[in-house]
Amino acid sequence: MRGIMKVFVLTGAGVSAESGLGTFRDKDGVWTKYDLNEVATPQGFARNPALVRDFYNARRANLAGARPNAAHDALAQLEAGLARRGGELFLCTQNVDDLHEKAGCRRVIHMHGELAVTRCHHCEATWPDTGPLKPDTVCAACARDGGARPHVVWFGEIPLFMDQIEDALSAADLFVSIGTSGSVYPAAGFVAEARAMGIATCEINLEPSANAYVFDEKVYGPATEVVPAWVERLLARL
């Protein structure tokens, strides 16, 4: 692992599951209880904004009580450890929670948006907001009401910061995917891009993902156990 100074880490729902935030695609996941077309699409919001707001208000309330776990803490330690060695961590998450930030990570790219941010459906203005979404919220930017929605990427919408993500991936020495299903694109394609550029790759997950066969190295087990151990090994080799 010597010579690795720029590490690109992609995290998914499996990182936050042990903090009490449910994953989406397992047998007990969020999408087994809700119709994603009704609560996670622009069309669903247009049809029934009250249902969508209720769904995300419940998720905000759940997030308010969540705390970072050992996997989040370890990634914050990795960021600090790389910085001390003159390296860099580029942390890109598919999660809409803020547990990486709460653990101390200074730079986090939320490609699917942030639950604790509200966006105006009318003008796209955003603002920090951990309270309940309300239909009568007036946007400070456009002075219209009725458009408050969570700042999350819904199905059919384009993920955020893709140019920045592609630049960071192309500059990386190591690509690591942690707690992802390997089935949500474009993120699921990052490992193939990394391999094509000759970048070392590693999957850390509870079990093999849909694209596990593409990775050079594989580490399996609960995130709170295997991520701290992997970070410790990596930093010891640098």
From Swiss-Prot:
CDD domains in the record: SIRT5_Af1_CobB (cd01412)
Co-factor remark: Binds 1 zinc ion per subunit.
Chain positions recorded as NAD(+) binding sites: 12-31, 94-97, 179-181, 205-207, 223
The protein's name in its UniProt record: NAD-dependent protein deacylase
Keyword Secreted: no
Gene Ontology CC entries for this record: cytoplasm
Stated role: NAD-dependent lysine deacetylase and desuccinylase that specifically removes acetyl and succinyl groups on target proteins. Modulates the activities of several proteins which are inactive in their acylated form.
EC number(s) per entry: 2.3.1.286
InterPro entries on file: DHS-like_NAD/FAD-binding_dom, NAD-dep_sirtuin_deacylases, Sirtuin, Sirtuin_cat_small_dom_sf, Sirtuin_class_III, Ssirtuin_cat_dom
Family recorded in the similarity comment: Belongs to the sirtuin family. Class III subfamily.
Encoding gene, per UniProt annotation: cobB
Transferase keyword on record: yes
One Pfam family of this chain: SIR2
Gene3D superfamilies: SIR2/SIRT2 'Small Domain, TPP-binding domain
Origin: domain of life: Bacteria
UniProt-recorded Gene Ontology molecular function terms: histone deacetylase activity, NAD-dependent; NAD+ binding; protein-malonyllysine demalonylase activity; protein-succinyllysine desuccinylase activity; zinc ion binding
Comment block on domains: 2 residues (Tyr-56 and Arg-59) present in a large hydrophobic pocket are probably involved in substrate specificity. They are important for desuccinylation activity, but dispensable for deacetylation activity.
Cofactor list: Zn(2+)
Subcellular location: Cytoplasm
Catalysed reactions, as listed in the record: N(6)-acetyl-L-lysyl-[protein] + NAD(+) + H2O = 2''-O-acetyl-ADP-D-ribose + nicotinamide + L-lysyl-[protein]; N(6)-succinyl-L-lysyl-[protein] + NAD(+) + H2O = 2''-O-succinyl-ADP-D-ribose + nicotinamide + L-lysyl-[protein]
Organism: Caulobacter vibrioides (strain ATCC 19089 / CIP 103742 / CB 15)
Domain annotation Deacetylase sirtuin-type: ranges: 1-237
Keywords: Cytoplasm, Metal-binding, NAD, Transferase, Zinc
